[in-house]
């Protein structure tokens, strides 16, 4: 029998999503009579391959095979497949086998599919076509019979393995829609076996005590809100405060997919109804509540939570039934980019302003916060439900909150706490809207401390002391408030952190009846949830609405993800200057109301792009965001938007296909670090193969306003020559890819491939084999699900859509709409590709000779020329300085850099910035040695920036594991072959690059440590943090070996693994010693380990390492803020 492909990662992924996974032969043998063999001597190879590669997966809760199973064939394969497809369509089941088929109706007529009465095909399905005509499947039908094959196709999921490491789905619910059982109700096993973390290496830390298992700190625990009486000793990555009592283990339910849920048996004989999906919730020590807590009356509002009714058929509720379904994070993105007219006032939609300060308004507020009611601004009054006693008693407190809000003078508090930090005359000049005062206006942003003072003052005025309960609770909330507004663009504050150390029993308004000193555990947990709901609303609604009412909050181009708070009065003036400058620079034509209405009513309506600005050091940068204005007939507009997006993705895929097939169309364009590495490596090896290395002349140039200056006529000409030269017909295949990473997280992506009919791989097996042969990593350890395939997309229709996209793009600036008359519409995936194609055509016509014996690179609009001919370098520079109006190409001399002298008269009186002949030449984040052609990384972009705000780090759930994985993932990105290739760089250069990578990792390590929640300290888990540091060296050394195959690097080589560990420890010692109060316990073990490594390393290697770690080479890091 043909040996089955191993594909262990694919099999593991399927086992995590299905109840049972069997090879086809094993599955049939279990059902058939003894002695029946699916594969017999003399069977054709294609059939034996099918049986070996086919996996049968059983869903949770799927029905068993028929009791009277027959192994006789009655129907032909085409008839059987048609019967299964008709049954799936009639039941409206989501099945891969039925993709592209639908039932006939009056609106969609046409001939039915063969052997069916009411099913038509509207898109080809290659899986069906394979089944209908395959001789292997016909032989399989003759061996297993109609009944079993129908059962396999209709009730199971079949997968075919494609060597070496992927598979595709034949039938069953799409894998990307199936959740793992652990995603429904996570269970904690009574005992779990600790495993050694990946990449952890303690061979150089032998002085440490024997580590039993540091992964025990990573083990999952029941989610619990901190409460009084609970010890505060948390493991580093614990998701909660460990309970004093032993966690109760619940059985894991069997999850059934589909619209109808059934009561499924559990191993204990009990039953319950599975929940369709898991929703985030308030973490509690125990999730079920007694009827005394009146859980059925509770539901948090809006996006915070949803309401679940208990099942009447279940005697034992699962641990997450009837629990509060809270969104566990408050995100900073909710208060970014607020719109308004520039007036500093509460928004008309501000919740508290729409409620009367009386008991009726208080009741409405209680319902909105705690009972899930939505704010009602107009319309008839709905029937009100009777409040329980607990919530009825809350009304006076929330009435007082409404009264305090009505009396609070927000504008006066704003002016008091967020004053401008300059002299009055400077402020008066700055508030002028003329462009010369733009820089003064940019400095008038409020600091996070000023914003915190304003918010604190508002909360002190509005929220009474009775709602806080104690000053301790108030201080805890203000501490979290300060942290919240100091987060970066992608920052999140978790509900667990918000409730950390809150004293629930001091909030008497949570009680349903007064005077009880001792309360049941269920009642205490209910009070915890109510308090969590209130604090979540206070931060996520009240504070966020205050910020959106009085500030415009945005990131900048020079401070990574750090947020800047501009008062609305300041930002309105900044925006008016930015709009004026943008209209002067870009050719736009204003549209009338009738034109806008006509544009929106068109079926292929372009999305209306909104223009916003972000600060940069010397002005404002316009950013175009593509969004859809729904307005009336929202459903129709949404369909228009989806249709337009699909066409845009098809056009993008088609241009990428032509670009790959004809690489010369892109000229010298590079699309990323991999392209730069491939091109630069080939150039360096070619130069070093010469008898004598010539002197190289470097030119760096940046095109001014590339996207806005390209003439649309020239762009149409370039694209027309690209896609209309052969009037091709394209085939578009859309498919999904599901894979699981090394941490066990399942990722899904949706892709499309465009080819011509001549290049089409019609069947999935051929298609996946072709993709794996062309790129071994493209589908590694993945499962592919084909969604659709279209074979009639003409190049002329795509070109017409391109013209529509180019000439009908609409930008909304303020309340006015404009259409772009010149340049490339921004905000879409096409913008960069179109710009590269246009400049590539220019290079092919003007700079073909310049690249002789040299190298021309361009990353979008940043040129780099390296040539041994001085006259060619001067010609190239002169051409760009004088401009190429035909392509809208004009460079910015202030950003132009050369390493040779240029006479001022030759360039019209101006001269570019000149560097020495031998220097480190900067280009696109790289430093290129002009003499040796070695490559360093440019870290000057980190100057005066905060690593803490630039690093997106989710620090709540399994914080330690998340921290380790985050650092390792960033390290893998930074350890690029361009810096580690010993054929491009010398050993000394590679050591310098590795040391700087480790030094930046040390800064990231510190940024993660100071963000760890729940008062975590390094001294509480010393072994774990030492393991993280050691794993950085092990991971980097493993990447170094992969980037230098065939080279001797080990103990007898030029760079042993101890060298990587020494550089790593040296970098971390340099950074952590600056924060000795935090890392005092780490410094001693690191120094001891480094001394042990010095004894193992040869003297020559130590000399290279010490030279690489010279502080004079890493002065760029001294200006980093963290």
Swiss-Prot record:
User: Which region ranges are annotated with the description Linker?
Assistant: 240-328
What domain of life is recorded for the organism? Eukaryota
- Tissue expression as described in the entry: High activity in intestine, liver and testis, moderate in lung, very low in muscle, heart and brain.
Indicate the annotated site residue(s) for Required for optimal binding of telomeric ssDNA and incorporation of nucleotides at the second position of the template: 169
Q: Which residues carry this modification: Phosphotyrosine?
A: 697
Q: Where is this region: GQ motif?
A: 58-205
Which region ranges are annotated with the description CP motif? 402-422
Q: Where is the composition biased (Basic and acidic residues)?
A: 284-295
Reaction(s) catalysed by this chain's protein: DNA(n) + a 2'-deoxyribonucleoside 5'-triphosphate = DNA(n+1) + diphosphate
Keywords, ordered alphabetically: Chromosome, Cytoplasm, DNA-binding, Magnesium, Metal-binding, Nucleotidyltransferase, Nucleus, Phosphoprotein, Ribonucleoprotein, RNA-directed DNA polymerase, Telomere, Transferase, Ubl conjugation
What do the Gene Ontology cellular component annotations say? chromosome, telomeric region; cytoplasm; cytosol; mitochondrial nucleoid; mitochondrion; nuclear speck; nucleolus; plasma membrane
Which of this chain's residues are annotated to bind Mg(2+)? Answer: 702, 861-862
Taken from the record, one Pfam family name reads RVT_1
- Region annotation (Required for oligomerization) ranges: 306-528, 907-921
The annotated region (Disordered) lies at 213-296
* This protein's record includes keyword Ubl conjugation: yes
- PTM (free text): Phosphorylation at Tyr-697 under oxidative stress leads to translocation of TERT to the cytoplasm and reduces its antiapoptotic activity. Dephosphorylated by SHP2/PTPN11 leading to nuclear retention. Phosphorylation by the AKT pathway promotes nuclear location. Phosphorylation at the G2/M phase at Ser-447 by DYRK2 promotes ubiquitination by the EDVP complex and degradation. Ubiquitinated by the EDVP complex, a E3 ligase complex following phosphorylation at Ser-447 by DYRK2. Ubiquitinated leads to proteasomal degradation.
Motif stretch (TFLY): 332-337
Q: Where is this region: Primer grip sequence?
A: 923-927
> Residues at site: Required for nucleotide incorporation and primer extension rate?
860
Return the PANTHER family for the record: TELOMERASE REVERSE TRANSCRIPTASE
**Domain comment, as recorded:** The primer grip sequence in the RT domain is required for telomerase activity and for stable association with short telomeric primers.
Family according to the record: Belongs to the reverse transcriptase family. Telomerase subfamily.
Name under which the protein is recorded: Telomerase reverse transcriptase
Recorded source organism is Mus musculus
């Amino acid at each position: 029998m043909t040996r089955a492909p191993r594909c262990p990662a694919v099999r593991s992924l399927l086992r995590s999503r299905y109840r049972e996974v069997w090879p086809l032969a094993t599955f049939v043998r279990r059902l058939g009579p003894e002695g029946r063999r699916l594969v017999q001597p003399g069977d054709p190879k294609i059939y034996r391959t099918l049986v070996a590669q086919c996996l049968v997966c059983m869903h949770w809760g799927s029905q068993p095979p028929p009791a009277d199973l027959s192994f006789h064939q009655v129907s032909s394969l085409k008839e059987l497949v048609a019967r299964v497809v008709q049954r799936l369509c009639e039941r409206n089941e989501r099945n891969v086998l039925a993709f592209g088929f639908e039932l006939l109706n009056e609106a969609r007529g046409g001939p039915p599919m063969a052997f069916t009465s009411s099913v038509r095909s509207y898109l080809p399905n290659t899986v069906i076509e394979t089944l209908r005509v395959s001789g292997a499947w016909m032989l399989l039908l003759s061996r297993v019979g109609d009944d079993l094959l129908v059962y396999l196709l209709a009730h199971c999921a079949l997968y075919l393995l494609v060597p070496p490491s992927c598979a595709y789905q034949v039938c069953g619910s799409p894998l990307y829609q199936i959740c793992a059982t652990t995603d429904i109700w996570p269970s904690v096993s009574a005992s779990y076996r600790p495993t050694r973390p990946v990449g952890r290496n303690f061979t150089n830390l032998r002085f440490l005590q024997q580590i039993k298992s540091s992964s025990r700190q990573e083990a999952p625990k029941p989610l619990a809100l901190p409460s009084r009486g609970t010890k505060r000793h948390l493991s580093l990555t614990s998701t909660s405060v460990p309970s004093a009592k032993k966690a109760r283990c619940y059985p894991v339910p069997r999850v059934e997919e589909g619209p109808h849920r059934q009561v499924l048996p559990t191993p204990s004989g009990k039953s319950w109804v599975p929940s369709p999906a898991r929703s985030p919730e308030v973490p509690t020590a125990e999730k079920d509540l007694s009827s005394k807590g009146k859980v059925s009356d509770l539901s948090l509002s809006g996006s915070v939570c949803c309401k679940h009714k208990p099942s009447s058929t279940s005697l034992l509720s699962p641990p997450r039934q009837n629990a509060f379904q809270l969104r566990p994070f408050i995100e900073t993105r909710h208060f970014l980019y607020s719109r308004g007219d520039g007036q500093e006032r509460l928004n008309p939609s501000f919740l508290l302003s729409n409620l009367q300060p009386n008991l009726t308004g208080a009741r409405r507020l209680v319902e909105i916060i705690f009972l899930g009611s939505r704010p009602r601004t107009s319309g008839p009054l709905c029937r009100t439900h009777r409040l329980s006693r607990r919530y009825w008693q809350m009304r006076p407190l929330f009435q007082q909150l409404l009264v305090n809000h009505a009396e609070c003078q927000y504008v006066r508090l704003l002016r008091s706490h967020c004053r401008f930090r300059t002299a009055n005359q400077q402020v008066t000049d700055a508030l002028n809207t003329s462009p010369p005062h733009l820089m003064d206006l940019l400095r008038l942003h409020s600091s996070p401390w000023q914003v915190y003072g304003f918010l604190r003052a508002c909360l002190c005025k509005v929220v009474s002391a009775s709602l806080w309960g104690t000053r301790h609770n108030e201080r805890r909330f203000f501490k979290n408030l300060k942290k919240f507004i100091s987060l970066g663009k992608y920052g999140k504050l978790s509900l667990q952190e918000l409730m950390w150390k809150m004293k629930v029993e001091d909030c008497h308004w949570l009680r349903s009846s007064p005077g009880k000193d001792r309360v049941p555990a269920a009642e205490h947990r209910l009070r915890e949830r109510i308090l969590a709901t209130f604090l979540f609303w206070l931060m996520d609604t009240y504070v966020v609405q205050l910020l959106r009412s009085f500030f415009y909050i945005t990131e900048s181009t020079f401070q990574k993800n750090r947020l800047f708070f501009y008062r609305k009065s300041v930002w309105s003036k900044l925006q008016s200057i930015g709009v004026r400058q943008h209209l002067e620079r870009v050719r736009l034509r204003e549209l009338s109301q009738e034109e806008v209405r006509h544009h929106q009513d068109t079926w292929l309506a372009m999305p209306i792009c909104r223009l916003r600005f972000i600060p940069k050091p010397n002005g404002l940068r316009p950013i175009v965001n593509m969004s859809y204005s729904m307005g009336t007939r929202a459903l129709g507009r949404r369909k228009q938007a989806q249709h337009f997006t699909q066409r845009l993705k098809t056009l993008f895929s088609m241009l990428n296909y032509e670009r790959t097939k004809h690489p010369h169309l892109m000229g010298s364009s590079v699309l990323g670090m991999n392209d730069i590495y491939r091109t630069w490596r080939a150039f360096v090896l070619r130069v070093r193969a010469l008898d004598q290395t010539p002197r190289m002349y470097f030119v760096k140039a940046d095109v001014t306003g590339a996207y806005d200056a390209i003439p649309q006529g020239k762009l149409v000409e370039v694209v027309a020559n690209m896609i209309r030269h052969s009037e091709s017909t394209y085939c578009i295949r859309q498919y999904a890819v599901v894979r699981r990473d090394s941490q066990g997280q399942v990722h899904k992506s949706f892709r499309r491939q465009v080819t011509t009919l001549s290049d089409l791989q019609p069947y999935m097996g051929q298609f996946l084999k072709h993709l794996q042969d062309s790129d071994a990593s493209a589908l590694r350890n993945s499962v592919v699900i084909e969604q659709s395939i279209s074979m009639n997309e003409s190049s002329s229709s795509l070109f017409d859509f391109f013209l529509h996209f180019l000439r009908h793009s609409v930008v909304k600036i303020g309340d006015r709409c404009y259409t772009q008359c010149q340049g490339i519409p921004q905000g879409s995936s096409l913008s960069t590709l179109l710009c590269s194609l246009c400049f590539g055509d220019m290079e092919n016509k003007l700079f073909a000779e310049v690249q002789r014996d040299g190298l021309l690179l361009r990353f979008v609009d940043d040129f780099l020329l390296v040539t041994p001919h001085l006259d060619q370098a001067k010609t190239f520079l002169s051409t760009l300085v004088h401009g190429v109006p035909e392509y809208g190409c004009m460079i910015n001399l202030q950003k132009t850099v050369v390493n040779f002298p240029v006479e001022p008269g030759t360039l019209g009186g101006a001269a570019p910035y000149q560097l020495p002949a031998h220097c480190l030449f900067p280009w696109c984040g790289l430093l290129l040695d002009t003499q040796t052609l070695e490559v360093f990384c440019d870290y000057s972009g980190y100057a005066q920036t905060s690593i803490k705000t630039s690093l997106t780090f989710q620090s709540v759930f399994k914080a330690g594991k998340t921290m380790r994985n985050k650092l390792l993932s960033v390290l893998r990105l930074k350890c690029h072959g361009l810096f580690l290739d010993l054929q491009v760089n010398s050993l000394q250069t590679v050591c310098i690059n590795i040391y700087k990578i480790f030094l930046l990792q040390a800064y990231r390590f510190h940024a993660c440590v100071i963000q760890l929640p729940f008062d975590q300290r390094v001294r509480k888990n010393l072994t774990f943090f030492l393991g993280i540091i050691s794993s950085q060296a092990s991971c980097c050394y493993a990447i170094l070996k992969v980037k230098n195959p065939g080279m001797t690097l080990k103990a007898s080589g030029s760079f042993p693994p101890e060298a990587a560990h020494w550089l790593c420890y040296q970098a971390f010692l340099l950074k952590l010693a600056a924060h000795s109060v935090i890392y005092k316990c780490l410094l001693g073990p690191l120094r001891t380990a480094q001394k042990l490594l010095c004894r193992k390393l040869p003297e020559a290697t130590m000399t290279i390492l010490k030279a690489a770690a010279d502080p004079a080479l890493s002065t760029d890091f001294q200006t980093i803020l963290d």
